[in-house]
Every structure is written in C-alpha cells, then in structure tokens.
Amino acid sequence: VRTGERRFSELLDRYGQDEVLGAIDDIMDQSERAARERTLSIPDGTYEAESFMDDDGVDIGKHIPIRVKVIVAGDRMTVDLSNVSKQVRGFYNSGPTTGYGASQVAFKCLTSPTDYPINDGSFRALEVINPPGRVVSAVRPAPMRSWMTIPMTVVDTIFKALAPAIPDRVIAGHFADLGNATMFGFVPDEGRMIITSTGPIGGGWGAKKTEDGVSATVCINDGDTHNSPVELMETKYPIVYE
C-alpha cells in the first residue's frame, strides 16, 4: 500500500492531478467500450440454467439449487439471482458481495477476458439482481465457513445459461472446488496444538468447443491463492506426503 501511495504521488507530481485523473477515466472508458461491444455480439434474449450442490453438510442429500437468469439487451447484460436457493442451515452460504463478484467474473470472462484491465468500467454494462437471504446473499446468523464454493458454481451456471447463444466463447463446467484439507491436532512432546491447511488443490476444467480443458489448475475464483509447499508442511507439522 505504501509503495502504491508513493508511486501514485509521483505520478501526480509529474503530470498533475487533472492529467492523471483524466487518464484513469480514459482507461475505465476503454474497458467499458470493450465490454459493451462484446455484449452486443450476444443475441438478445433471456437465458436460464440450473446447477446443484450436493447438500449443505447438515441436511444430507438435500440438493442446493443454483438457478440463474441472464438477460441480454443490446449492450447490457443482467444477471438475475432471485431464484438461487434460500440460505441454508449448513455452512454453504456466502455474503451479499458473492453474487455480484461471481457475476462480474463470468461477465469479464465472456466480454473482455484479457485485452483490457479490470476496473469499474469493465462492469458498467452489467446489472446484478441479488436479493438478500439466498446462499449468494446470506444474512445473519447464516454460517459461511465454506462460502467460497458457491461463487464457482454461480460462474459455471452463468456459462451454462449462455452456452446456446455463444458456444464458441464458453467452457463446460470445471471441478469448482478449493480441494482444500484442513488438519488439526495436538503434539504431546511439544505441548502445542497445530492447525494447518493444504491450500488449494488443482483439478480439471471443462473443454472449449475447439480444445480440451486444462488439468491440475485451481478453480476460477482462486487464482490469487498459493498452495503450501510439501517441504514446508513436513518440516513444520507431523505430516508426511506420499
């Protein structure tokens, strides 16, 4: 943060406030134009899809439906999450930002995944309807320990909804899980409790129309998380990997 503050101050000193803020606006406007142009290439219409999570860990065997509706009108897209499952008793709930974030990830992937930076302009053409009380917008006292599994499924379901309209630009669903294992225990000789996590484990991604999916890759909303080196885990904890 301090480095960013210093560099930004240097830009202001060098070019002046008006020039810097104007450049920022231009960058965001470029991202907006790119997103709108790609959205225009999607046929207007209402697209719907449904996925399921197995259960919430409490009501075993009771599926959690993830239903999305995507409305494309000109250069705008609306993602409606009103019919996603209501929040559940178990820990597969997520806060209100999750529905928005997952919709933004899907929108960015489908409109301008690599050619323009991610900023506010990237999402000006996107509206998200996310009423409270759902697994993507849970309210107190809903448990949220495994919140991160929900947005991956939402992204895949948005792709699924739009697959008939833009089959060349979507992939089939991926493994959509952190693959994370948390271990805890007591070390008698040292008199201490240990709690550790393996970090994200890669899995398989769905294929595109033109090529197979990638393997051993982290899930779509976990690109900023690093796994734990085996050597470090075996040194710090009474764990042996094979």
Segments (PLM) and residue ranges:
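Glycine/proline-enriched, intrinsically flexible loops and inter-domain linkers
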Residues: 1-242
